[in-house]
Each structure stands twice: as C-alpha cells, then as structure tokens.
Design a protein with these regions (language model features):
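Extracellular glycan-modifying ectodomains
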Residues: 1-160
C-alpha cells in the first residue's frame, strides 16, 4: 500500500510545470488568473484527431480567438467548461464559429476546460461588466461541473 507521503510526492505538481503556468512568457494551454485560477492560454496541444495538434490561442480580452465577423459588434457571449471552450479543436473550428457562420455575426467564446460552475459564473460576471459584455449569454453547465466548484485540487485526483 502506498503511504501518504508517497501519494503526495507522486500527485504534487512539479515546480517546472508551475513555473510555466505562472509565466506570461511561456506558451501554455492555461494561464494563471488570480480570481479564477486560470484562463485559456496560447498553445499547440497534441490532442487532435489522429495525433494532430490543436491550435489554441486567446485574444487580449481572454476569449478564444475567432475568425468569423471579428469586425462586427458581438451580441452573444458563451461561458463554461471544455465543451464551451471546444477542447480538441483548433481556433476557427469551435461550435461558436459554426453558429456565428449560420447567424452571420460573431460569438465570443469565454469557455475554459476544467472550469466549475462557480468559476464560469465568476468569469461571466467579470467580463459582462466590461466593454466585452453582450446582450445574450450562454452559460453551459454539464455533468460533474458542480463538483469542480468544491474540489480543492483536481490535479491530485487526476494524477494519483
């Protein structure tokens, strides 16, 4: 049986990973945020179809980069977890981009993989008080998102 000390040593996040996470100079799929914990970063992630890389970038306002109708004002903002963020897809392939093409107007994607309901809600409140606020909001909640609001360290659960 594994001891408590061995478990902690095995499940603790390594210093190098934390250094990249806290650095604004390193590309990372997640960037530190003092209020939310983290937000979407800029990275090439090897999680696409057949081992391909997904290109994930974020705009200055923290939204995932979009291609459709960027010059137009936005009436719809989306918030939530990895489904909202569209993990495992590249910029321009998100469901928000497909819906934007159908509606003929931009849709901002403020989703972040791993977010709990409260994190997504806090991000919604923060963003909607800025010039990036929208007339219509989509707050996506699914499955275990509510548990994520009470778990202190998901890393220890994922990497036991």
């Amino acid at each position: 049986m594994i001891s408590y000390e061995q478990y902690l040593a095995k499940s603790a996040v390594q210093k190098g990973v934390i250094d990249v996470f806290l650095s604004e100079d390193h590309a990372s799929c997640a960037q530190f945020d003092p209020e939310l914990g983290y937000t979407v970063g800029n990275a090439l992630i090897p999680d696409g179809m057949d081992g391909s890389l997904s290109i994930m970038t974020s705009q200055a306002n923290g939204a995932r980069s979009s291609m459709m109708y960027n010059e137009m004002p936005c009436r719809i903002n989306t918030y939530g977890n990895s489904f909202t963020q569209c993990s495992q897809t590249s910029d321009g392939e998100t469901w928000q981009e497909y819906l934007a093409a159908h509606l003929g107007e931009p849709i901002h994607n403020f989703g972040v993989g791993g977010f709990g309901v409260y994190q997504a809600y806090r991000r919604l409140l923060r963003t909607e008080q800025t010039e990036d606020g929208a007339e219509y909001l989509i707050l996506y909640i699914w499955g275990d998102d509510h548990f994520r609001s009470v778990m202190r360290c998901r890393h220890a659960v994922i990497y036991p």
